Structures are given as structure tokens and as C-alpha cells.
Amino acid sequence: MKLLPFVNGPALLAAVLLSFPLAAQSIVPIPPAQDPQIESHVKAFLKVLNSGGGKPLEQMAPKDARAVLVGAQKSVKVDLSGILVTEKTIVQDGLSVKITVVKPVGVVGALPAFMFFHGGGWVLGDFPTHQRMLRDLVVSSGAVGVFVNYTPSPEAHYPVAINQAYAATKWVAAHGKEIGVDGKRLAVAGNSVGGNMAAVVALMAKDKKGPALRLQVLFWPVTNANFETVSYNQFATDRFLTKTLMMWFWDNYTTNPSERKEIYASPLLATTQQLAGLPPAFVQTAENDVLRDEGEAYARKLDEAGVNVTAVRYNGMIHDWGLLNPLSQVPGTKSAMLQAAAELKKALK
């Protein structure tokens, strides 16, 4: 990774990240600086990001790419107050999984909970990179967040991570009292590929007659291994998550075409019959995100299957805007977290 000049705040995260390479595309997108669809704070973030000259993540070793995100999230001071964090290793169905339990302070008794599966393309990300986002959801919802530390790729490939996610969900539903949780008031949530995992865990719970989930919260989710949607081509470059980077993430997760078509990898390919009976869904997408179209398509398909769905597109935003600490004070981020927390609170009461 290239060393870049020292800058503060949003500029620092942008600078230490990378400048993504151009990808083949069927249309020529508008440069971010001239794009009226990008919110002003986000546009300033992208201006520095895209002029950084750093090495693309997809050209790094996974451990180096992970370090970039960790350092970037640490570069901005954020509010982590109001929560109590503990760790526990659980065993379920022969799988050992470490969970990080995030509770709101000053609350006693068994609380409702939501499982949280983190984003980062199945390759990047951990609890520290997602702590601020999780904290915001916990404090505003009053529910416990159970962060699942699944094994990333390429150390493990599909379906290892999703099996760990489902095992952890089963354990919390059955043994929640051990961590101060009411397992009968349980939801699933996740961002990006974590949104994929939340959707898939909901499918698995239905198929396997597992936990009765109250809600699935899908933040800008991955739902299909199809890189030729309108949004993939329109936003292929210069908007944080690029087409080539997402292809690299999928390659680390699974390169097997038949596996990519399984509904536990690409839930958008599930039939309406397979989707019928799933818990209500709350789906957020970003206007300027390669994943926008597949997230919205999944919401529409859930609705077609008779599932209660609320789908919200945040105009002006880019992929993972709600995760990125330098964008944590952007009005669109605050509103997104408050809205999701309100949906959790309503479903888990």
C-alpha cells in the first residue's frame, strides 16, 4: 500500500483506503465530482478517495486488505458510549463460534436481540470495524446485538461462514438466557455480505424449522452473483465499492458456478415459494451502489412472495455509507441507523 500524506477526518479514511481501478462497463458513469446524485459530504469523501493513488484492495493479500479497513475505521473518533461488550465462544451442531455480545448499559432483565453478520466481502471486517454501527443500533433500539465472528475467506469458503452464522443463531435462540437475552424475541441483521448472510439465515431457519425470527434487517445486501445489472455498470468505478472488487470478494467466497446459484449463496434466485413464510424484512439500499439493484430486486421478490417488506433507498449515498466512520455524522447515516433501530424495536417488543 502506498503511503499517503497525512490528512484528518473523512479525508484520512479516504486517503488510507485506495483508488479503485477502472472496470469494463457498458456505459460511462458520470465522474463523482460532476454527479448530482451524490450527496455533498459523500462527494467530498470520494474526491479524496479517488485521488489517493493507493493499491487496489483486490491486488493485495487478504491480510493486508484487512489492515487497510481496520486502520481506516480507527482513523476517525466515534461515539462508542452506552454499551457493554463481552465475548463468548459457543458450540452448536458441532461448530465452535465466537460471538461478541453488545448490550445497552443500565438495562436489567432478558432483552430482545438481533444477530449481526458483518460486511467486508466475506474477506474483510471484524467487530472493531463494525463496533460503531452496532453501537448505534443497540443504543437506539434497546436490544442486544450479537456479533458473529465467522471465519472469513479465503481461510474458509462457502458454506462455512453461513453455517457458522446459522449455528450461532440457533444457539442464541435456545440458550439466550446465558447471555441475558430472550431467545424468543430475535431478529437477524447484517450489512453488505452480512445482509446476504442475514437473508440466508432467515431462509435456513425456515427450511430447517429453526428459530422463529421476528425480522430480517438487510443493509445494502448482496443477493446474487450477477455483475451485469444496471447499477453494477453505472457505478462500476469511483464510488467506494467497485465492480472488480466485488468480483474479487465473490472469488474468495466461491468460484464454483453451481454453488453461486444455490439460494444459500444467492438468495435472489430463490423461488417465491421458497421465500413465502419468511419473517418481515427491512431493506436499505444506496442510490450510488453497485449492489443497489439486486438489493431492491430481493425486496420486490419477497413482497411478491407475500412477505411484509419495507424497502428504502437512500439517495445520494454510496455502498456501506452507514458503516464508514468518516460518514457517521452525515444526516443520511444518522437517519439510516435510527430508522433500522426503530424497525428492530417495533418487531422485538
Locations of the language-model features?
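N-terminal signal peptide c-region/cleavage motif recognized by signal peptidases
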Residues: S19-P21
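Bacterial N-terminal signal peptides that target proteins for export
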Residues: M1-L12
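Alpha/beta-hydrolase superfamily serine-hydrolase fold, recognizing
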Residues: S26-K349
